[in-house]
Regions:
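Short substrate-entry loop that stabilizes the transition state in hydrolases
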Residues: 143-148
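Bacterial N-terminal signal peptides that target proteins for export
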Residues: 2-12
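Lipolytic serine-hydrolase domain surface
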Residues: 26, 30-110, 121-123, 128-130, ...
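Short, low-complexity, Pro/Ser/Thr/Gly-rich segments in the mature regions of secreted, periplasmic
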Residues: 391-425
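Gly/Ala-rich beta-loop-alpha elbow adjacent to hydrolase catalytic centers
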Residues: 213, 217, 221
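C-terminal motif of bacterial Sec signal peptides marking the signal peptidase cleavage site
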Residues: 21-24
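Alpha/beta-hydrolase fold active-site loops
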Residues: 133
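The conserved beta1-alpha1 loop
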Residues: 136-140, 214, 246
């Protein structure tokens, strides 16, 4: 395994301090899930279907706690977003006091419990866009119920994704000191997530399901898909794309999980960042085995294995993060949110047989090079590096058009775009 060097105690202490500073809800009031009843003029509204394995909280304004419930509870939750002039893409604006100011803060507009086995199906039918696509979000470690709801509302709003949005929130206590409890809670929630995905994919109103999971939620997601494949012999055909953002996954374990999905598995896209400090700590406390979300996809053995498995990797290392941990770039970066939304709105996967996501990024880089009239490296022109076979072909075609001199300059980058972890099955 690459780079299994022990982290100094001082560095670990620094990571813990940073996580403590960013983890909590220090300045947030308790009870943001209290419904306001109506959305204020000038705001935008995001309607979400929220399924959870959390236990109900005694406080109705909190709604659900970090403890484990006995079943799957489903709610329709509407969230209002402040006017564009009062916010930045990628930000969740928490109220500093209640009642929240809808012109400045995210506000819960309504919360409606959905009873019965088919309640979720009815909600999907009434909220299904023309694309007939569903996007399921699974949050990560150290998230409360409201964290998952507001974060996904922000992603849906900022990406302009043409989807019916579904949140699956599992029993995280929202504390950095409950890492092991949270991990066991993901295992506790596998059956429920598998059932939700199976029902969603079986809904005749749905044509396509994309799953986006973050951090520890990627473990839950891949485990649920693995369980589905073992139970049924395959993953549900409508589940075409799986996006793993900053995956807190042991690379060796992921290789085995991926192989268990079989040949007719979804296409996987992974967001990685070598400067992810949260994953650095996770790696340290997990036996110093590389975490999937922190690998360098341009080096071996990852390059060849990812390429053979047909996995697309977006390396966000050079992209500026929105927090000191660099663990939420996928949602906080306007560039990444836009890339996700543009592909989903077009009714395409993150990459497809005709256009690689890297082509859009590459076009920006190539345009900059042409404008400058000089040889500029793709890696310098854009902070997002894309690694997949289709992207490499697209870059090659563009490079030929730009001439051999440019080809010589960016050739090394082009060679790296095609990374490919697990062996192809």
């Amino acid at each position: 395994m690459i780079g299994k060097r022990r982290a100094p105690r001082a560095a670990l202490t620094g990571l813990l301090v940073a996580m403590m500073a960013l983890s909590g809800c220090g300045g947030r009031p308790v009870g943001v899930m209290q419904a306001a009843g109506t959305a204020a003029p000038g705001t935008s509204k995001v309607d979400l279907l929220v399924a959870t394995t959390r236990a109900a909280d005694d406080n109705p304004a909190v709604l659900f706690s970090g403890e484990r419930g006995t079943g799957l509870a489903v709610n329709a939750v509407d969230v209002s977003i402040p006017p564009e002039a009062n916010r930045k893409v990628g930000q969740v604006q928490w109220p500093s006091r209640l009642p929240a100011d809808p012109l400045r803060d995210f506000v819960t507009v309504s919360v409606d419990p959905l009873e019965g086995e088919r309640a979720g199906e009815t909600w999907l039918k009434s909220h299904m866009p023309k694309s007939r696509r569903v996007l399921v979000f699974v949050h990560g470690f150290n998230n409360r119920y409201e964290d998952a709801v507001y974060r996904f509302a922000q992603i849906v709003h900022d990406s302009h994704a043409d989807v019916a949005p579904v949140v699956f929130t599992w029993p995280s206590r929202g504390s950095i000191f409950d890492y092991n409890y949270d991990k066991e809670s993901t295992n506790y929630s596998r059956d429920a997530l598998e059932e939700l995905l199976t029902r969603t994919a079986a809904n005749p109103a749905v044509s396509d399901v994309t799953i986006m999971a973050h951090s520890m939620g990627t473990w839950l997601t891949v485990e649920a898909l693995r369980q589905m494949a073992i139970r049924n012999g395959h993953v549900a055909p409508k589940i075409n794309n799986v996006i793993l953002a900053s995956p807190d996954l042991d690379v060796d374990v992921f290789g085995r999980q991926f192989a268990s999905l079989g040949k007719d598995r979804p296409h996987f896209t992974i967001f990685v960042s070598q400067d992810d400090r949260a994953l650095a700590l996770s790696r340290r406390i997990s036996g110093n085995v590389d975490r999937l979300g922190q690998i360098d996809p341009s080096v071996e053995p990852y390059r060849s294995k990812l390429e053979a498995a047909g996995i697309t990797v977006l390396d966000l290392t050079k992209l500026k993060g929105g927090d000191r941990l660099n663990h939420g770039k996928f949602a906080e970066s306007p560039e990444v949110v836009k890339l996700i939304g543009d592909r989903l709105i077009a009714g395409q996967a993150i990459t497809d047989s005709n256009v690689g996501l890297g082509e859009a990024v590459g076009a920006v880089a190539m345009g900059a090079a042409q404008t400058a009239g000089s040889a500029v490296s793709v890696a310098v022109s854009t902070p997002i590096a894309i690694f997949d076979q289709r992207t490499r072909r697209n870059y090659d075609a563009q490079l030929k058009r730009l001439g051999q001199s440019m080809n010589n300059t960016v050739g090394s980058v082009g060679d790296s775009v095609g990374a490919g972890l697990p062996e192809s099955q």
